[in-house]
Amino acid sequence: MAGKVHRLSGEEREQLLPNLRAVGWHELDGRDAICKEFHFKDFNRAFGFMTRVALQAEKLDHHPEWFNVYDKVHITLSTHDCGGLSERDINLASFIEQIAASLS
């Protein structure tokens, strides 16, 4: 991805995070990251969700930290290039929400 990535400012956080908090994303204690656990009907839907997210993450060159247990997928987002939350995380989280909603 072209251009320097910057960590979100306090003002940017106040503007961008409330919408994600409203749908269940939360900030991690002791780390500048956001996370959420998603629940699906079964493993097949969870894996399909992960596949769709992975394809978008590859396009964005921004990859989540995640793990899957049967019908659950836990995702953590943070930008290593700036050592914390960036607009990349917000954009990927928004995309993830769209995919999750389409599979509900």
Curated annotation (Swiss-Prot):
Residues reported to bind substrate: D61, H62, H63, S78, T79, H80, D81
Residue numbers of N-acetylalanine PTMs: A2
Reaction it catalyzes: (4aS,6R)-4a-hydroxy-L-erythro-5,6,7,8-tetrahydrobiopterin = (6R)-L-erythro-6,7-dihydrobiopterin + H2O
Keywords from the named record: Acetylation, Activator, Cytoplasm, Lyase, Nucleus, Tetrahydrobiopterin biosynthesis, Transcription, Transcription regulation
Subunit structure: Homotetramer and homodimer.
PANTHER family (UniProt xref): PTERIN-4-ALPHA-CARBINOLAMINE DEHYDRATASE
Name of the protein described by the UniProt record: Pterin-4-alpha-carbinolamine dehydratase
The species this protein was found in: Xenopus laevis (African clawed frog)
Taxonomic lineage from the root: Eukaryota, Metazoa, Chordata, Craniata, Vertebrata
